[in-house]
Structures are given as C-alpha cells and as structure tokens.
Amino acid sequence: MPLPRSLFSKDAPQDHDLRVVSGQWPDALSGELVLSAPHPDTLSGPHPFFGEGMTYRLSLAAGTHGAGPETFAWRQGRIDSPSARLRAKRPDVFEATMIGVQSPFGHTNAANTAPLPWGDRLFMTWDVGRPVEIDPVTLGYLGDVGHRSQWKDFEIAPQPLLPLVMSTAHPVIDPDRNVLWTVNTHWGSLHIARWDGEGAVEQWPITGAIIPQSVHTITQTRDWLIVADCAFKVEPQVLAGGERTEPANHDGPVYLIRKDTL
C-alpha cells in the first residue's frame, strides 16, 4: 500500500487536546502512547532517514498533562540533543548525504526511530548513533548513553564533537539482568554492548562475526542474544504502493550469542 501523504507533510508539529467524536473511550484504558519520527523541517537530502528526532506522546487517560477533563493530551517535542543544537546554530555547515548529516563537528545523532521504555526512564534510538535518554514527562533531552570513548567511532571524516556510532535502532532491555543490550559495529566487525543504566558501557568483540551492512534489530531470549544483518534494500517503487522485487540476501548472517559467555 502507498505511504500516507501526511508522512511527506512539512507542517510544523503542534500540541493538541483531542476529543472522542465517535464511539466511547474504554474506561479502563490508561497510560501513554509514545511515538518517534523525524522532524518534518529536516527531511531534506537524499532521503528522510536522517531527520532530527521528534517525540510524540498521546495520553490515554483524559484530563492529564494539561488537557481538559474530557480531552486527551497530544504533546510533541524536538529532541534538543547536542547535534540538534549545533545544527540550529549553524545550519549552513550541515549537509545531508547518503551516509548521514555531516558537518565540521561530525555527524548528527537523529534518534528518530523508536522509543525504548526502561522502568520509569525513556530512551529514543537510531541505527547510527548512541541511544538518547529523554524525560518522559517534559520530553526534554537528558543525555546520550555512555561517553563517546566507550563506543567505537565509525570515523570516515573528522568528528571532533559528534561521533558516528554504528549501533541498532532496536536495542533490548533484559528484565532478568536489568541491563540494556545493543551492538556497536566497526568496519563490519560485531561488538556486543551492555549498559547497566548508570556506569560505563561495556563491550565485547564477537570473534569471526562480520556484519556486511548493519544491525537494525537485536533481540533476545532469557539466555541468548540474536543478531542479524538487516540487508536493507532501497526500492523507490514501494513508496508509491508497488511490490518489492528484491529478495533479502540469502546468505545474510545471523548470530546467536550466549549472554553468560560475555
């Protein structure tokens, strides 16, 4: 099916107080629906993947977060990360390319792909950057996960302030160990990364494990991590509702890694 035209709109995001106009809202429904997307005014360049991260939150209970007693709060905010602040100050030196938004400062960390809750904390993620923590109430930026020295930079140009970190857009929270598992690939070599939420990011190289392209998702069982190459292929006709014609690589690697061996 074709993508909705609203995805290509560059209208400025706004807060709204929404009303139910048909049917009845379930009384027992509560909580928050959190979405991630690129900001529409940064969708320039070869494709929209590198637009700066936005957070959208719909409260599922009426009368919260400033909404009236019969309305539901739709709130949004741009992630005010260091790269977003630098780009706002000097937009003239940032250039969207096929491998990211580059500048003399380094590469932007868009953090525009997926929300990741961890207890009462909230992180926003992306394939080509460290996970970013935001305040789940104010949606304000709190910090990137780990110091840049704890990650392996994919340095194809000088990156004095903004490192390019090849990670995954979908890390996982381990409920048994209360840690975050992710990856850090470096020139094709696979490293597993673990973070306890407070200290330094730990990493282990996986001997012989090669990632031809990138790792979009890491998943888990109680004892194992599962990592696969995403083998992403761009097919422009899909955007217009056409069928995919390129199959996934039949030889794309999948790695099963025991957690207790790290």
PLM-predicted stretches and their roles:
Residues 1-104, 109:
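N-terminal regions that are enriched for targeting/export leaders
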Residues 38-44, 230-248:
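Short, conserved, GDST-rich strand-edge loop motifs in beta-rich repeat architectures
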Residues 79-202:
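Well-ordered mid-protein domain cores that form the structural environment of catalytic cofactors
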Residues 148-152, 207-213:
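Short coil/turn segments at the loop-to-beta-strand junctions that recur within blades
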Residues 184-186, 194-196, 208, 219-222, ...:
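Short, structured patches in soluble enzyme cores that scaffold and shape functional sites
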Residues 52-58, 137-138, 187-201, 238-262:
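Beta-propeller blade signature
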Residues 39, 61, 128, 186, ...:
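Residue-level signature of beta-propeller blades and closely related beta-rich strand-turn architectures
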Residues 29-35, 120-123, 177-181, 224-228:
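Entry beta-strands of beta-propeller and related beta-repeat scaffolds
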